[in-house]
Amino acid sequence: MRSLIAMYQRIGLVPLIIIGLVLGVLIGWLAPNVGIALGLLGTLFVGALKAVAPILVFVLVMAAISQHRSGNEVYVKPVLIMYMFGTFLAALTAVGASFLFPTELVLVNAVIEQVPPANLKEVLTNLLMNLVANPVQAIAEANYIGILAWAIIIGFALRQASDTARTVVGDFSDAISQVVKWVIALAPFGILGLVANTVAETGFEALAGYARILMVLVGCMLFIALVVNPLIILVKTGKNPYPLVFICLRESGITAFFTRSSAANIPVNMNLARKLGLHEDTYSVTIPLGATINMAGAAITINVLTLAAAHTLGIEVTFASALLLSLVATISACGASGVAGGSLLLIPLAASLFSIPNDIAMQVVAIGFIIGVIQDSAETALNSSTDVLFTAAADPKYAR
């Protein structure tokens, strides 16, 4: 048994994930029943990540702040600026792509269980109310805005505690981090189960009818990941951005693509930030915050599908209305994590700017759920990998 574990560790996590990915595709394609059964591995893996992430964020932030000493620099502000700027550029990119490659949708009738927010005020209100949630409830419901708020408050309070108390908090933080490493080590099995189940259940035919809209969506996300984000990093650091970009895509993006959950990928990003040698005082705050408000992929989804609906209905989109849509998408995307259904349920809000009827907007949402196996995966991979990318760029390790 020890020799097997040693061999498993020697191969490395990324090669094992690739092996799991290939095996998952083959099993899901050739033996669908086995693929569906293996889906339990993926469910358990995502469940374990989601279970450990809230307590990890709470303890890590609390420990980092309680042990912070005046004079130790933190780099949260520049990361937040990059989050917002990057999301706005993603929204503009989606608008440009929608004009270059106008897409018409074959609308479908479907029942959407979730209720979309009525207006932007409701989105922002939900986001602010998350700040004052009960701390135990926030951890139980993975409300990261609430978790961060309480962890910061308690962390400041613990600065007045004895050295022994702060040491205990630090030791507990180290213990939770070790648990996260053990969970992440099981990623190849989780990816195997997730991929096998997805291929077995959806196949490849279901997405063929939506190839054009998928190409626009994924093309925008690739453009942000491989062109726009590197330009932001180049301006910020003055260095070749691609080594860091590819590290983040490989170590964070691949896992996020298959888990389809920014929250579940928080432990993965925390582990990567630690491997990169970044300041814990910074990444313990910016990474969970990024999982909540850094939503470039969501902004792309909102704009592309909204403008596709406008093109389908023959609605003329002016430059001013497109710019307004980008601003609304940027702000709305920041609240996407607080809306059931995420970015897709914010489409009716954006569609209202063009007086698109709500029943049509909900049909567009239904299309979003159909293509979600690709759209949501790519969106999460972009969002989550960008969290650690921008955090690293703001760190002196990657400064000029």
From Swiss-Prot:
Its main location: membrane. The gene is sstT. Belongs to the dicarboxylate/amino acid:cation symporter (DAACS) (TC 2.A.23) family. InterPro entries: Na-dicarboxylate_symporter (IPR001991), Na:dicarbo_symporter_sf (IPR036458), Ser_Thr_transp_SstT (IPR023025). The chain crosses the membrane at residues 11-31, 45-65, 81-101, 138-158, 175-195, 213-233, 242-264, 295-315, 327-347, 354-374. Involved in the import of serine and threonine into the cell, with the concomitant import of sodium (symport system). GO terms for biological process: serine transport; threonine transport. GO terms for cellular component: plasma membrane. It is a multi-pass membrane protein. One of its GO terms (molecular function) is neutral L-amino acid:sodium symporter activity. It comes from Psychrobacter cryohalolentis (strain ATCC BAA-1226 / DSM 17306 / VKM B-2378 / K5). The keyword Nucleotide-binding does not apply. It is found in: Cell inner membrane. It catalyses: L-serine(in) + Na(+)(in) = L-serine(out) + Na(+)(out); L-threonine(in) + Na(+)(in) = L-threonine(out) + Na(+)(out). Keywords: Amino-acid transport, Cell inner membrane, Cell membrane, Membrane, Symport, Transmembrane, Transmembrane helix, Transport. This is Serine/threonine transporter SstT. SUPFAM superfamilies: Proton glutamate symport protein.
